[in-house]
């Protein structure tokens, strides 16, 4: 028994309210009131053995289930202080199962429409679980379309158009270098031809205003000329006395009567 509240009606009288407690009060000592003795019962396998043998050893024993199912009048006389024992095998809820129940055999044909509907929903959920994305991505997220072939970053051989460009550039560079060189040779020849005195030495004070291709003043009398220019200018005068000037055209020999 458990005292809950004390009401003060008079200073000399007290009223105690009490209700059934679900705590094992034997832990606190002997109870104040008399408690009904619980009937003894055997486990279910013992009862099954006795039934199979057909032996009735004595008066039938009252089980807890029968005692719980007694009338409320008998309950009011002797209150039950212990809680009812729950059945651990009782089905609590119907939750959809995601396992393949066809492995356990065929279902009974007495199933209702609701069960068939839930089975269809479960099958739909199972189909979505087995879906896998495609191996190759398609659409705007793909880095390149599938139809375009891959191009090698480092080609194995040199391209065919490079030699043409290189030869063209070499030809242009050679032409560009030969043109000013020939102009400079012609100018140098004309300057040396005009400025050569009778003594055969070139003038040391030659003007250097011909640009970057103008020849430098030479200290020695010999001037270096290309064979092309000498052939063009001095092709007619091959015979004659040798002079130290190779680049300039030699003077005509004087006749003996002069």
UniProtKB/Swiss-Prot annotation:
<keyword id="KW-0914">Notch signaling pathway</keyword>
<feature type="region of interest" description="Interaction with RBPJ/RBPSUH">
    <location>
        <begin position="117"/>
        <end position="145"/>
    </location>
</feature>
<dbReference type="GO" id="GO:0015631">
    <property type="term" value="F:tubulin binding"/>
</dbReference>
<comment type="function">
    <text>Tubulin-binding protein that acts as a negative regulator of Notch signaling pathway. Shuttles between the cytoplasm and the nucleus and mediates the nuclear export of RBPJ/RBPSUH, thereby preventing the interaction between RBPJ/RBPSUH and NICD product of Notch proteins (Notch intracellular domain), leading to down-regulate Notch-mediated transcription. May play a role in neurogenesis.</text>
</comment>
<protein>
    <recommendedName>
        <fullName>RBPJ-interacting and tubulin-associated protein 1</fullName>
    </recommendedName>
</protein>
<dbReference type="GO" id="GO:0007219">
    <property type="term" value="P:Notch signaling pathway"/>
</dbReference>
<dbReference type="GO" id="GO:0022008">
    <property type="term" value="P:neurogenesis"/>
</dbReference>
<feature type="region of interest" description="Disordered">
    <location>
        <begin position="195"/>
        <end position="258"/>
    </location>
</feature>
<feature type="short sequence motif" description="Nuclear localization signal">
    <location>
        <begin position="81"/>
        <end position="97"/>
    </location>
</feature>
<feature type="region of interest" description="Interaction with tubulin">
    <location>
        <begin position="145"/>
        <end position="258"/>
    </location>
</feature>
<dbReference type="GO" id="GO:0045746">
    <property type="term" value="P:negative regulation of Notch signaling pathway"/>
</dbReference>
<dbReference type="GO" id="GO:0005634">
    <property type="term" value="C:nucleus"/>
</dbReference>
<feature type="region of interest" description="Disordered">
    <location>
        <begin position="132"/>
        <end position="182"/>
    </location>
</feature>
<feature type="compositionally biased region" description="Polar residues">
    <location>
        <begin position="236"/>
        <end position="245"/>
    </location>
</feature>
<feature type="compositionally biased region" description="Polar residues">
    <location>
        <begin position="71"/>
        <end position="81"/>
    </location>
</feature>
<keyword id="KW-0524">Neurogenesis</keyword>
<comment type="similarity">
    <text>Belongs to the RITA family.</text>
</comment>
<keyword id="KW-0963">Cytoplasm</keyword>
<dbReference type="InterPro" id="IPR031418">
    <property type="entry name" value="RITA1"/>
</dbReference>
<feature type="compositionally biased region" description="Polar residues">
    <location>
        <begin position="201"/>
        <end position="212"/>
    </location>
</feature>
<comment type="subunit">
    <text>Interacts with RBPJ/RBPSUH.</text>
</comment>
<feature type="region of interest" description="Disordered">
    <location>
        <begin position="28"/>
        <end position="86"/>
    </location>
</feature>
<keyword id="KW-0539">Nucleus</keyword>
<dbReference type="Pfam" id="PF17066">
    <property type="entry name" value="RITA"/>
</dbReference>
<dbReference type="GO" id="GO:0005813">
    <property type="term" value="C:centrosome"/>
</dbReference>
<dbReference type="GO" id="GO:0051168">
    <property type="term" value="P:nuclear export"/>
</dbReference>
<keyword id="KW-0206">Cytoskeleton</keyword>
<dbReference type="GO" id="GO:0005737">
    <property type="term" value="C:cytoplasm"/>
</dbReference>
